[in-house]
């Protein structure tokens, strides 16, 4: 299982790629926030970055499944 660590807008994230076109996105910090995203096979990393920038992780429920299309 591949993991990608990156910083975006001074926040730290880990993307953990799972089977069945799913990725777990973890926003690290004082308390980790985790969401699971279903994506299509043609989804690009830049698509993830745009979505992550627009999400307010403090308002997302942990382990909620979202779909990128």
PLM-predicted stretches and their roles:
Residues 1-69:
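Polybasic (Lys/Arg-rich)
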